[in-house]
């Protein structure tokens, strides 16, 4: 356990007006704060109603006080929580009062969670889950974040790490004792155990990818020529009139954003200005912003007005658009206005892109598009027992998988035990970065400073 010598204070509840506001204090002087503000020692882990006083004994507020001595607290240190009235002025007066006590400072963003991590109250993935739970934008995301906080993700990682450790011991024993009559590397155990670890890792990667989608969502840009129905599609997907829709080409001049959920999957929809030769400076800026959004998208919905062309292949519809589209960008062709053309609604493939025929105006075919977007991201929607994951987690899992693949190739091709042992060690290190067992101070700083103050 790493007990800090300084004591920190911050408001744990969100800033602004509320019925209740909570001040959190953590560190060796938490008990001194209770004596100074309340005037007496508090019984550990009991809620006590008391007045909160300034240095002159004048009452600032009154509320509930709770004291948690180390190590049985959120941070693993002595912790005091003062639950008062949630007005910003009241909270500010209480914090200023506490800061007048020597040896107490304002907490940095995420410092309470950081201390909990450093004091082994939780691992790094669990600490990150606190922020994810607070930021959850759907019920499904909240459940996944809570699972991570309860250790579902960490337990899977720890199981993989333990398996790697046992396999490393076996492989290194085979290297260190070559005089043994049994060829440990050729007896099939190492190969079988390694394949089992790879299979389990791939299963965790699949779950983690779902968790990352749940956290970060999918950025979809609707692009195409003016008056193709882009704004109508934005309204149809979001279920509200976010964008102005008229028969006048070029009505949308700037980027419009809407955030929705499809069976729990966050979807960031972006409607852009119609792409054409700009008629004025305002339109030119809007078109450039449209291309900027396209460059950052996970997928582009290429809108086509079905009443203007019978073509379905984007190479025939607008080759210049494809030429400027970023390489490897996922694209779906949307033939709009099926209510006017009489085309059959549905999904099919034209060369590589998927083609969807729909009517953004009537909403026919839009459900097929929603299901298509889930499939594009590999989102199952079934997150019972799932966990939240971040991009850094996916990167660590990917690196671990790469090194296990290299080790497997060396084992099967050359019986290279030394190289296999090294690849196992590196894979173990990458997995341990997820829970924080092997993590640089720089990474810890970047993770915890992204938290709210008071968390």
Curated annotation (Swiss-Prot):
Co-factor remark: Binds 1 potassium ion per subunit.
Residue ranges of every copy of the TrmE-type G domain listed in the record: 217-378
GO cellular component, one term: cytosol
Biological process according to GO: tRNA methylation; tRNA wobble uridine modification
Localization in the cell: Cytoplasm
Residues engaged in binding (6S)-5-formyl-5,6,7,8-tetrahydrofolate: 24, 81, 121, 455
Positions annotated to bind K(+): 227, 246, 248, 251
Positions of Mg(2+) binding: 231, 252
Key words, A-Z: Cytoplasm, GTP-binding, Hydrolase, Magnesium, Metal-binding, Nucleotide-binding, Potassium, tRNA processing
SUPFAM superfamilies: P-loop containing nucleoside triphosphate hydrolases, TrmE connector domain
Family according to the record: Belongs to the TRAFAC class TrmE-Era-EngA-EngB-Septin-like GTPase superfamily. TrmE GTPase family.
Function: Exhibits a very high intrinsic GTPase hydrolysis rate. Involved in the addition of a carboxymethylaminomethyl (cmnm) group at the wobble position (U34) of certain tRNAs, forming tRNA-cmnm(5)s(2)U34.
Protein name, as recorded: tRNA modification GTPase MnmE
